[in-house]
Amino acid sequence: MKPNKLRECLDSNQPSIGTHIHSSWPSLIEVVGYTGMFDYVEFVAEYAPFDLYSLDNLCRATELQGLSSMIKIDQEPRRFLAERAIGAGFQSVLFADGRTVEDFHECVRAVKPETPEDGGVHGVGVRRISYM
């Protein structure tokens, strides 16, 4: 598993610095990485046009720059997009527009493995992250 700088900062109670991007252009992440100023990049998919191939390329760019990755997804189809984003290599998923406690429980189930211990619904997918 790739190092997750954002998770490391959170676990050690340290501040982190990230930036938001609304473009699926991976070269933008390269520019952000070359500044050396950020721990993570958040792709705001809720407001940005993208295709599923773009998710793979955005994650490749963050990995090459040593950045953590986060994706903010819209309320629907949140489970599908969360599974595809994790499969592409995103390390964090930010769910937008939850309205009820059950909405947020479903969000957590969407990103947890489908095992008796974890209680999630995220199955094994043959995606980019599974063959790395």
Give the label of every model feature segment:
Residues M1-H20:
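N-terminal amphipathic alpha-helix/helix-capping segment at the start of soluble metabolic enzymes
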Residues L28-N57:
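Glycine-rich, proline-tolerant flexible connector loops at the mouths of alpha/beta enzymes
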Residues L52-R79, E83-R84, V111-D118:
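Alpha-helix-loop-beta-strand connector modules within alpha/beta enzyme cores
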